[in-house]
Amino acid sequence: MESSSDIKIYETFDEMGLPDTLLRGIYSYGYEKPSKIQSMAIVPFKEGNDILGQANSGTGKTATFCISSMCRIDLTIKKPQVMILVPTQELAKQIYEVAKNIGVYLPVSCLCATGGMSIRDDIHAIQQGVQLVVGTPGRIYDLMNRNILTTENMKCLILDEADQMLEDRFYKQVMCILEIGFPNTTRVALFSATMPKEVIEVANKLLQNPVRILIPPEKVTLEGIKQYMVQLDKEEWKYEVLCDIYKQLNINQALIYCNTRKRSEWLADKLSTDGYPLMCIHGEMENSERRKRMEEFRSGRVRVLISTDLLARGIDVQHVSLVINFELPMNRENYIHRIGRSGRFGKKGCSINILCPNETKMKDDIEKFYSIVMEELPLDLGSIVL
């Protein structure tokens, strides 16, 4: 699959024909010039084309669909016109904040609708005239099934992290939402950092003559992110190596990934007991506690966060300079999502993969698939620039 051949690239936001009020929001939010995905995708979606868009993590996918979809909202109609489906509450909240900030000079009403939050508040907000809704499939389907969230005025349907949204976990929920029905004029966009063949096949059934903006996997660059590995003979040596890294590196903010809740909690308890300040977050935690801990990390009050793949996708924490994979992810697609947390928006970043023998096959698979080479971690960690 290749990108469409006739895509016009816009070097500035001013060239895109965006409303002045939207441009003010874009610039006040801190954007200066479009990223590659923004330069290629905003105008086609704004002008009524379906989009299949791929760009690696941290390149501005969220702003791409927020900007283009806001252009399609009829400000005189106080009904839902944009629906954005995402896999996690944290990602929904992030997109909601981006939409609010970019649209700050527009009279656009936005709603973040996810499980764990009051559905009464969601219903009230929609009845008051919400125009853009971002949420997780379960809550969105519930609101649609109650005939509270209706689609007759829907201009845009967006699936973010499409590779995850169209896999088994969410596939049925997403299909139920689609089966409720959207007008033929509703434009659909799928965005993700990775586009496995299976997902492209499903996407082709959902999209009408889409503009394809695809970066092949071997070109999904992790430029600016130095990738190291430590190969160990025994699993139980991992903790000691992690402590050595912790002691020697001057870390601004770091994410440490484990594959399961149990493993994350074990590691967090062990590090805390040994005097290392950090927090742990996972999908089975109470929503209020997850939000609290995420805010602590995002604000910089907590510098190290241990996580499962809950945070691998789409969470924008600007000052993360180091990602440590205490365990390699169980699928190669999550590798790029994980280490994309460092080196956001062109900043330098570093990832360290702590490996035991049973992870060698996955390491080789990742290196081959993404055409990368993980370097041996130098003994002198002072040579690593974060």
Protein language model features and the residues they cover:
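Conserved helicase RecA-like core
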Residues: E2-L386
